[in-house]
Amino acid sequence: MPSTVEILKQELPNYLHHIKNKNSEEAKKQYCISSLFGKIFDVASEDLDFEVPTKTVSKLRGRADTLFQNIIFEWKQDAKNSKAIDDGEIELKKYFQHFLEKEPLKKYVGIITDGIIFKPYLPIIEKNKVTSLSITNELNISKTSPEDIFYWFDNYLGKSEKIKLTSKSIKMQFGLDSPNFVAIRNELKNLFDAVRDYKDVKLKFENWSHYLEIVYGEKQKEENLFFKHTYLSTLVKLIVHLKLSSMESNRTDEILPILFGNRFAQFGIVNFSEEDFFTWPMQITIRT
């Protein structure tokens, strides 16, 4: 049975030829759903909801074009048209606010697309209000290899087949341009805002800034850089642990021992992952 990447290699030229000749948003939507989502990525039409009505507490109404699990698709005739994108972003903010009020624990992604260009967005949330949008790793399938197209869609559509672990697949899934990082960075910002005045957290941030001053010649006060370092430090610890444990253990109760370094000592590795500047999200006030 051919892999998804092999199917993409076979079907992509024909898909691009036809999608470029569709002259309406509806035609592009129908063709993309049946050919790209259905034929290549096995997304069944019955798993999609169309024209989903939305309404916020402030009575802003909308109608989401297509909903698949936690993904909101906003279809456009031309995703290179700046006005169309601006209009789409306004609509996505309404949809995000609706779903935040309806399902506050569920994380939604919005994608503005014309079937060729896919622009994914995540909401920036402050005090239970969607204040702005953050765009992540935009995809143009006419300029991207079948392998990278597969990795990109796997981030959102969740293919069941196993992905070979390579530096490229890790970067696509967890890199600083990935939706995973953008979502976690937003969560880290909200957490940091809640505990920034705690003595231990403040000390970690100040010590981190001091050490970077030695490297760069001036103190680093950029919180986004601190969040990046926190994310990357945590990710490395988790990946190394998965490798050492042969990926046999994924229990959430092991997260604390991994991040504080205790689990690595059990493998005979010391001074690799002791408590550092980036364990601040493990503050008891956050965990409780």
Residue ranges of model-derived segments:
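Short N-terminal signal/transit or membrane-insertion segments
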Residues: 1-6, 49-53, 175, 224, ...
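A general structural-boundary detector
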Residues: 19-20, 53, 60, 82, ...
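Short hydrophobic/aromatic-rich motifs at helix boundaries and adjacent loops
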Residues: 4-7, 65, 208, 212
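Charged, often low-complexity linker/regulatory segments
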Residues: 1-46, 58, 178, 182, ...
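Phosphate/oxyanion-binding active-site loops and adjacent basic polyanion-contact surfaces
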Residues: 24-30, 83-91, 231
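Charged, often flexible domain-edge or linker segments that flank or initiate folded functional domains
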Residues: 69-80, 84, 93, 97-287
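Aromatic-acidic/polar surface patches that form glycan- and anion
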Residues: 25-26, 62-64, 225-232
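Active-site metal-binding core of divalent-cation-utilizing nuclease and nuclease-like domains
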Residues: 40-69
